[in-house]
Amino acid sequence: MAASSPSLLLPLGSASRNGLTTKNPNSSRYIAARVIASETREQSCKISNLSSRREAMLLVLGVSGGLSMSSLAAYAAGLPPEDKPRLCEAECEKELENVPMVTTESGLQYKDIKVGRGPSPPVGFQVAANYVAMVPSGQIFDSSLEKGLPYLFRVGSGQVIKGLDEGILSMKAGGKRRLYIPGPLAFPKGLVSAPGRPRVAPNSPVIFDVSLEFIPGLDSEEE
């Protein structure tokens, strides 16, 4: 269990308290971000309502391993991998075959499914992104789409795995990208398996499809 490695997602409750500062509190993007944070705080309150010790242990293991609560709910429901929502469906996969691969100095590789518009997020800025995380075989081990809400974190600040951090830093709002993350930039201690979720071996490569929905701070400045 990768308890000492960077968590996959930053808890939105703490993010909204410390980082969602904007010049326009009535901005639609700002309000949306506050709703996202509120939803996550409500999810955390469900810990006290778990019906059994086994459910409580499952939740604790999932959170410490960097998994979203929504993912655990989907796995517990026995949702088959092929029925899980994806950012890149069959037609997208075919088109991706003709997209050139970009390789960075760190070894990260990526293909742009869709190039966004505007500036890339500066280091330390809040970003709202959807993602689908997979092992090389294509099996999903975590996904924000299963809850239907994007996640917020400070990009470039070590709040997510290194490959995801680096991959998003050069994206633009509205963009969508597939990241081929090598082991050293992924999960050094791996992730344990769970019902409906494959094991991620230590220092093994993973694939992330990422959609950068918006950048709250830049959005408020533009308005």
UniProtKB/Swiss-Prot annotation:
Protein's recorded name: Peptidyl-prolyl cis-trans isomerase FKBP16-3, chloroplastic
Feature: transit peptide: 1-36, 37-76
Main location: plastid
Annotated GO CC locations: chloroplast; chloroplast stroma; chloroplast thylakoid; chloroplast thylakoid lumen; cytosol; thylakoid; thylakoid lumen
Keywords: Chloroplast, Isomerase, Plastid, Rotamase, Thylakoid, Transit peptide
PPIase FKBP-type domain segment(s): 124-216
Described purpose of this protein according to its UniProt entry: PPIases accelerate the folding of proteins. It catalyzes the cis-trans isomerization of proline imidic peptide bonds in oligopeptides.
Lineage top rank: taxon: Eukaryota
Catalytic activity, reaction form: [protein]-peptidylproline (omega=180) = [protein]-peptidylproline (omega=0)
An example Gene Ontology molecular-function term: peptidyl-prolyl cis-trans isomerase activity
Enzyme class: isomerase
Subcellular location: Plastid, Chloroplast thylakoid lumen
Family membership noted in the UniProt record: Belongs to the FKBP-type PPIase family.
Enzyme Commission no: 5.2.1.8
